[in-house]
Amino acid sequence: MAQDSQGQQQSLAKFAFNIYGTLGTPQSSNSPSANSSISSHKSSKRLSKNQLSNSYSRRLTYNAERDVQAIGQLNCGIQISHHISGNEPSHHAVIGGKNYLRLLCLNRDQQQVLQEIDLLDVKSIYRSRNPNKISSVNTIKTRENTIACGMSNGTISMYKVSPYGKGTLHAMLSDHRRTVNSIDFIDSTDHIISGSQDGSIKLWDLRASPTKPVFNLQANLHNDPIRACQYSPHSVVRNKTCILSVHDSGALCKFDLRSGSGSNMYSPDRKWNLHAGPVLSLHIHPEKEYVATGGRDHKICVFNYSEGRSLRTTPENIINTYGSILKVRWSSYLVNQGGRAGDGGGMGSMHTSTSFGDSTLALTNYDLACLYLNDDPTVTIYNLNRKYIPKQIINPYSQKAISNFMWAQNEIQGRRIWTLNKANQFMAYDLDSNFDTDIKRPLDDLPPIGMSWNDNDDFIWVNQAKDEFEANFESMCDDEQFLTDTAAAATATSTAFTASTSTNTAIAAERASSFDLEDHDHKMAGSSLGTSPIERPSLTRSYTHNPMSQFMTKSPSPILRSGTGVLDMTSPPSAGSALSTSTYTPRPKLARNPSQTTQGSAGSFGSTPASSSFAIKYKSGASGPGVSGVPGGPGVPGVPGGPIGGSLRLNSMVKSPFAFPVELPFNDEEAFKFLATEYLVTTPEGFTLADTCLMNASVAHEVGAYQSSQVWRVLAISLSDEKTMNAAAARMKTRTTLDNKNHVDEPDSANADHFNAATNMSATTDPNITAVSHTKHDQEEDVDSFALKSIQSDLDNVVGSYNSNSTLSIKYGRNINPLSSVSSHGIAYHGNDVHSRTNSMHHSRANSFNNTHSVRAGSSGADDHLSVHSQSNPLAIDSTTSKRGDYELENTNLMNSIFLRSSPNSIGFGSSRSYSSLASSPIDARRALPERQVPPEPLELNHDTSLILEKKQSNHSPKLPKRSGLSIALKNDDHHDCENDYEDGTEAWSFKSLLKGALEYAASQGEITFVSTIAILFYELARDIITFDQCLGWLGEYVEILQRKCLFVEATKIINFAPLDVAEKLKTLYAADTIRLYCSHCLKLLTNEKSKRQTHGEFGYWYCDECLQRQLNCVFCNEPCKGLVVAISLKCGHRGHFGCLKEWFIDEQNVECPGGCDVPIVV
């Protein structure tokens, strides 16, 4: 009695507290009443704008006295004492827990608890005689004024709430043996179903017998616990009573109560296994026969359980989450229905709710919220229109784990969620509010441009607009604002192709009038592509803004072609021109690679791709605009034969998202292994460094490393050039010394004529014609000068080909003769056929940059032609003066075969496939080549003689040719002298300059194979370019990579062939007695540091800590390879103990692998 009187006093105190209007003052924390965040509905109207902004950041919070875990909503009017009759609130909250069940009466805006009712403190015939018995409320379900509570002891309590807020215990149902997990009403408050942990679903008829169920359902004979069950209201139209349930076995079961016989059913009508593990929750869609299920497998499945899709076994949609799903619920209202104006309703503004015939549209019209299992403090809201990114996330500042939630119904049909956390707090969240800091919106923080990598080292980047994701264009065609923006975009597009500004204005006005857009001129200007760049976002402007539209110059109109969407016309159309576009079709796409560009085109790789077309239908008798980009069109007045009504296709200007996949050709494992194995790191016997570079160029070309191949060839030619020039300079120095020693005095004019004749190579190519006699010394000087000119021309060809836009075998419209390049690199011609040598060099020197500079001013046409051929003639050594051994001829044949097999874009090598076979000798290879189709021009004696006489009369000084303008520009005159240009090697195309540039670029690009090979080959030759630290760093990193890729033979080769001082350091770092074992599964180094730090267990390298797998057993004894034994890997991949393999191969004299793979091991 004392407790009852104390409770009455507290109720009177709270009643008086409410009467005198002090609800706005904060209540004491000791009081069990609610803590209200907003005083009343009237006082909230008097708040200022700043206070209103702060009030949105506060929410309704109620602190319960005991543990609560169940939540429900009672949707019936309750008369509160101080509210006027007929205006009572109709949405209230019900929370329950251990010996706790409260009804929280809320005000109309659900921002305040007006009254709380303890439903357990009622007198009834069903009340237990032991009031201190613990009974926990596990689930709550309400309908009208009835509250059903599923208890943890297996009973079901039914409460009735009167219009005056008085609760009574109406019935108690007890037939379950374990906890009741789910309750649902069937059409009325007289029939309910309940699912229990005992694996049964029971149907109760409160009118017949309140103590015994009328129907029992089980999924199978075994007791499969039921986590949730729900009645399907959509099956009533087919005269069925359908019940869905989910179980711990991961099954979704469908029962039809009207198809069973008797009062028990032990097998469902349909059963689907959608989850891999227990399913903890389900909820049926408010409009369609779809159900959402969530379980421990971190998935939310949306499944169509209708009769027409009963044979389907896979879900319609799957949402992958980061945790186990405890509860999943559909929203109560449409995503674009209700809410305050100006609030961020997420993507709801994009969806239309006018048509519910489409199931997909019905699914996206409702949001889906889920709660996670393992003490997670968040509630995540998804929408199937964008199921991979959460729409909103409720993440409380207190970070208290949420135990239950539900979608709350309200008068304004807003998106609100009620939650219960493990701090025993009831909290309300308004998802339509932009001022709640506990509600996160990932889409607002998501950048419009993103990129991602795949497993093949390729990446893709996406550019999209947030508000255009999967927008339904067909449903938007009925929207007046959408048509307005589309017409404005079409007007802006046609503006770029019209003849003048006046014409553009006329077309825009005509199209605007056809769309009835006179009242929306400002909207058209805002959405046009021709607006100021400042008014547009930077990311959008980067691929939609056309800078050419800013100029007022007259641009040509596009050529219109019939049948392809554009009509033929020869002149720019005027404003009143009439063009029939009744046969308009979208223009086909061009099959073009992303790397190919068109010069002068406005589009680029990052531009907007071709947009898809969509149909806009006009009413009969209404005129429509012209096709985008074409003046006039169907429905335009004045067009002969143009239809007034019908269908028109408009191209949308921007469609989102834009995906650009990019394939990167680097990090190719097979190419890396091939280059590491085939690259020559030392010069073979009988070859030179230039030959080694050419061989490496062929290796790089085979794997598609065309840039590296070209660099190797450039280095080879530059190296040969430098070697030849040094030899020529040495011979000239020797000749000068001999001349000074013998005191040979000749007239200055004779010396000048002699030097000019040697430099310009004016001597006739016919050995039978001798115009000027030379000594043997002079002939050697002529040969050296010829070599200088020939190699310089080769180098010019290399530079021009390397800097050109194309690296194909076609160079300036001419083919390259492979024999000319072979002869220019020191491979002699056998024979005295001067015409054949001249003809073979005609092609290889035709594109030389020195041709225009070699012809002397004032020469005749014949002299110019002769001068070109004479200067570009290669170094041709007669067979009588060339003395080669058999070994050198063998190397020549090998190099000849390499050159003939080289790539089409090789510099100076043959590319014809018909001559790619290995010839027995250079003579056989040359004989296999076809003769030149154009006959050679005969050499005339009078031209040659006149040229020589002219050179005799010149007064040139006997010195090297004057430097070109390119040499002066590329060379620093302050540090070098013009007389020794060919001696110091400081030109931009000198060997060391090219080597330095190639190393710097390759190192910046991470081409470790190239820089390491270069470092080994040219370390001794270019110590001033390749330092010791650079060489050691490159080779050390290269050896590390080779060992990581299990290329131990190649790694050892690099250490052995490294320079001496670098090799000593590498051998100390990578000693020969170091054994590194790699996992046979994940290919990672077996360090097993985790196991080494553990004190228990057996440590070894016969298992892997990274992938947690044991290594391969011995192929002979099938035991783990551990202990003090040696594991020997065979060619086939098997491994075994040293003793076992010794017994198999040595004692038993076997040659095949003991694993049965028949791979010969011992040969």
UniProtKB/Swiss-Prot annotation:
Zinc-finger ranges (RING-type): 1114-1157
SMART domains (alphabetical): WD40
Coiled coil: none
InterPro entries noted in UniProt: WD40/YVTN_repeat-like_dom_sf (IPR015943), WD40_repeat_CS (IPR019775), WD40_repeat_dom_sf (IPR036322), WD40_rpt (IPR001680), WDR24 (IPR037590), WDR59_RTC1-like_RING_Znf (IPR049566), Znf_RING (IPR001841)
Residue segments, region Disordered: 24-52, 525-606, 833-881
CDD domains named among the record's database cross-references: mRING-H2-C3H3C2_Mio-like (cd16488)
GO annotation terms (biological process): positive regulation of macroautophagy; positive regulation of TORC1 signaling
Protein keywords: Metal-binding, Repeat, Vacuole, WD repeat, Zinc, Zinc-finger
Gene Ontology terms: cellular component: cytosol; GATOR2 complex; vacuolar membrane
Domain of life: Eukaryota
Subcellular localization(s) per the UniProt record: Vacuole
Signal sequence bounds: none
WD repeats: 129-169, 175-214, 221-265, 274-313, 346-392
UniProt xrefs under Pfam families: WD40, zf-RING_16
Biased composition regions of type Polar residues, renumbered to the chain: 539-556, 571-585, 593-606, 868-880
Gene Ontology molecular function, alphabetical: zinc ion binding
UniProt feature, compositional bias: Low complexity: 28-41
Free-text function comment from the UniProt entry: May be involved in a process influencing telomere capping.
Family: Belongs to the WD repeat RTC1 family.
Protein name as catalogued: Restriction of telomere capping protein 1
Organism annotation: Lodderomyces elongisporus (strain ATCC 11503 / CBS 2605 / JCM 1781 / NBRC 1676 / NRRL YB-4239) (Yeast)
